[in-house]
Structures are given as structure tokens and as C-alpha cells.
Amino acid sequence: MTTFFWVPFDDSDWNHDVYCRSIPAHGKILPHADGSVGFVGHENVSWNQVQANDTLVLAAHGKKWSTDEVAWRKKDGTIVQWSPTVFAQAIRACLADHYGQQINYRLLACFGANNITPLARSFGSKLAAEMSGVGLRGSLTAYKGATGMDANLGKQIGSSRITCALSVLRHLGTMTGSQPTDDASVVWTL
């Protein structure tokens, strides 16, 4: 079982976190959505190498006050935003004929498992529904609070928008966190 990382757009924040910290921990980098090489100087692989039971880490920026989109800031400063529908369709298209395999997806996007109100749905839950709808199989894990990369598969700061802000204030603006706990993650079966 292999861990693959996908940053759909050339986003300098995620490039630093995913490529420089996590990839030496035995991960493989998939090309950006436009097909460009994910990272020069590291093993870049193609989507047809993703097999059943592999882990596919999806890196994006969650939005602080919305569960309708995730985003990436490209090198030229433009921001690309994807809805759960667009994200699921992009994954499906990239996997091509391999889309029906059981894959362990991990969404690394701040507040990916948080909803805004008790009756709202998180981005992760919306993405899981869309992924199932386009025929993707396996599981999707998303995390509450702010997430980032550290060591192998991530770190977590707080478990909500409020506790994340309190943690940052308490540590004078520094994002300090720990490994995600079981109650900080939500898993959906696809």
C-alpha cells in the first residue's frame, strides 16, 4: 500500500508542506490537475500507479466561513476554488479506468470535517457524497480544526474554528498542533 499526494494546483503553501516535509516519508507525488509535474527533484508518478487499498492525500485550503468550496493560491496570486462536485469529478477523471477501486482518501483542508451550524454539512461530507455519486469507492477521512502537514499524514490545531483561533492566540500567532486524534477525524464510506 502506497501513499500518494495530490495538490491540484501549484500552491506554494502546500508545496512546502506536502513536498518538503511529507514526501521524504515514502509518499509519491501526483501531477497537478493541468498535468504539470508536481515537484522537480522528487519521484513524480502517474495516476495509473494508484492501486486498490492505497492512500490518496488530497491537499487544499479549507475556507474559514464556508463549507461549499476549498481553494488553492497559484504562483501568480490567483485563487482557484472548487466545489465538492468539481473536486470529485476531477479525482474521477484523473483515476480514469481505476476509479472504482477501494482507495483510502484523506482530505487535508482546514475545517474539512467541521460544519458552520448544527444543521449544516461539512465540506468533507459533501465531498464524500459527490465522490460516491461519481463512482469512487473506499473511504474519505477529513479532520476538524485547522490541519497541516507534519511528519507523515498531518497535524491538527483545535477541533473547531473557535478552538483553532484560541490555540493560535495562546501561542502568539504560531500554529502549534498535534497528531490528529480519533475524535478529530470523521470517516465516510464511499
Residue map of PLM features:
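Active-site-proximal C-terminal subdomain of hydrolase catalytic domains
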Residues: 104-190
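Catalytic-core segments of thiol-dependent peptidases
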Residues: 2-117, 168-180
